[in-house]
């Protein structure tokens, strides 16, 4: 079973890989990425994200949590 950190890394990797180029999902200011809310639950066998409403709610809790994850991804590009 994947650890919590492994799961979070997979979610963020999938999000950045799939949604970074989609219009309107990211807003950049001062080198920080803001406001994402795409629902991602897990990766399928082809590495594509599988979305559900449940995970949309889970990952849309707070803007500050989103900003913290975006800052982590920017400051540690090799982490994900």
Where do the PLM segments sit?
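Terminal leader/tail segments of proteins
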Residues: 1-80
């Amino acid at each position: 079973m994947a650890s919590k950190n492994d799961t979070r890394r997979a979610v963020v990797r999938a999000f950045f890989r799939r949604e970074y180029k989609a219009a309107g999902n990211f807003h950049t200011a001062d080198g920080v990425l803001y406001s994402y809310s795409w629902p991602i639950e897990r990766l399928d066998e082809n590495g594509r994200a599988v979305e559900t409403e449940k995970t949309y709610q889970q990952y849309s809790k707070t803007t500050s949590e989103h900003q913290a994850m975006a800052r982590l991804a920017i400051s540690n590009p090799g982490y994900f």
